[in-house]
Amino acid sequence: MREHKRKYDMLAIVGPTASGKTSLAVDVALSVSGAEIISADSRQVYRGMDIGTGKDLDEYVRGGAVVPSHLLDIVDAGEKYNLFEFQRDFLAVYDDVKERAAFPIVCGGSGLYVESVLKGYRLLPVPENPALRESLEEKSLEELTTILSQYKTLHNNTDTDTKKRAIRAIEIEEYYRACPVEERSFPQINCLTVGVDVDREVRRGRITRRLHERLENGMVDEVRALLESGITPEQLIYYGLEYKYLTQYIIGELSYDEMVKGLEIAIHQFAKRQMTWFRGMEKRGVHIHWIDAMLPREQQVEMIKDLLYD
């Protein structure tokens, strides 16, 4: 049986938002003995942030069969979870999965998170730099993005859709310039990386439909409940995208139509940045096997299994 001839230690399934990568990962996991999913999503770690992040725990259930999942709902909303913490938590889960002779499937759209474990870069907690922050505060998001684009290292953050996150990303870059670090002792992971390739216009249509579905299914109420729980508008706006725009709508900074229009544009731009990151991963030496998102699911699963086994 090909179950005994697996060629890889781990499978990574990546793709932009609305590509269907999570449901594909679940279907692959159900057809691979002992498979468990490790989420690589920078926002699905937060409890209570479900609709806005596209986190649907029911998606991990198929006909009564539950696929074990990790790194979902591990941090309280309002806190800030970073790449260093993800690497730490990933290694703990990865070691546990391997010790139990299970098979890890990493799935997510945060290319930075995925690449950080595939390449094994050492990351340290980065302290705040008040002087640098003050010097950057007057710059626009566009100017900050231009500054970020000049850095060549792995540590750039593709989720910089707010000034605060862009400034933090620059702060991290400057810290690593001043305090270079060596690679940490990551396990050597022989990983098969699969990308879900979705046509740009198809992706745009899915994003638009999904946004309106989420708005109809309680996303505004979700954000309102987070605010009522004591989380400040500033804390929610930090997370960007849905939480930024819906918070601005709820506190009266945007009309409903302005919120929907602005958010839709921002999500399209985010998906484009995700794809740019994945293409960059390829240039940095990560081989990604691209699979057409429009193929029948059974065919997608078989293609991945053909790559996974001898």
Predicted regions and their residues:
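Phosphate/pyrophosphate-binding catalytic cores of soluble transferases and nucleic-acid-acting enzymes
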Residues: 1-310
